Amino acid sequence: MSTTSLLVQSLPVLAQGAVLTVKFAVLSMVFGLLGAVVLAMMGIRQGEPLEGFERIWVNALAWLARAYVSLMRGTPLLVQIFVIYYGLPSLGISLDPTPAGVIALSANVAAYMSESMRGAINGIARGQWLAAYSLGLSWGQTLRYVIGPQALRIAVPSLSNSLIKDTSLVSVITVTELLRSAQEMIAATYQPLPLYLAAAAIYWVLCQILEWVQRWYEKRLSLPARN
């Protein structure tokens, strides 16, 4: 079989894998960003002049957030995927490959994004907090309506490209994303070079598309807020 015929025959299979890759990346980015916001909120109040039980509670949450981030950033993503998919069943928690992969990627993204999110929140002038408090807003309302929208503009997710590439790791738990689709075609045709190159080209195209979307999103966020 010629290389051209092979690629034409393999394209539908690779396209299905590419669609699943994009779904993995989008879901992981959304859930990871939500997790990053939670982790950032757990740590931003540390250092405030609090007293009694509230101080203990805030410090405990901040410590838990730091421990989680250190653990997730200090261990390989592949190991995290294995722990969730192969390790959790020993605790009675069995997950299908797809949700296990999404959870692993999301947990990893949350750890990496939380620090930039926390830095963005802390980068907002303290006077804006005080002004919101003087208007009667609570801490949560101030974060939601005043600080959060501004911090989001600073901490626009910047993991799009790496996340697309990281999705290839879920192939080890039998998720038929792009890399796994290419491997299945290789097993059937015994022609690894053109198929791996085709998969690499598709990864590159996906990264370029997401990079363009990210630049557009950053430009939208940089515009002054309008009602």
Segments and roles (model prediction):
Residues 1-227:
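Transmembrane alpha-helices and adjacent helix-loop boundaries
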